[in-house]
Amino acid sequence: MTPEMLKTVIQNNIKASLEITSPNPGLPVCFLQYTEQNFSRNFYHMEFAEYKTLLEQVSKALLEAGRQVCLVDFNPEQYKKWLKEKNLTDSQQTRSAFASGLGKGPEI
């Protein structure tokens, strides 16, 4: 992955998570936390190690900016069920909403 592509992924990840919590900045910004087994290289267009580093950097930056951060363990079966119940398709926005819902943030 090129540095420019990584920058775009970082920006999209932060943007999606912040859009969900922006109506209430007191809510934590939630991100999904994957294991190597349930991480999707095709979805994120990066390797698992890159994602872990990115997650650490983003979380640290948000904490330094005064935001709360929560990491939610990703459960693929639970996520698929949630998508079906909400009649949604897989996207960065829906993954962020799913993480926020599990992290007691707002749902879409």
Protein language model regions, located:
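Amphipathic protein-protein interaction modules
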Residues: 49-106
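Extended, charge-biased low-complexity segments
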Residues: 2-44
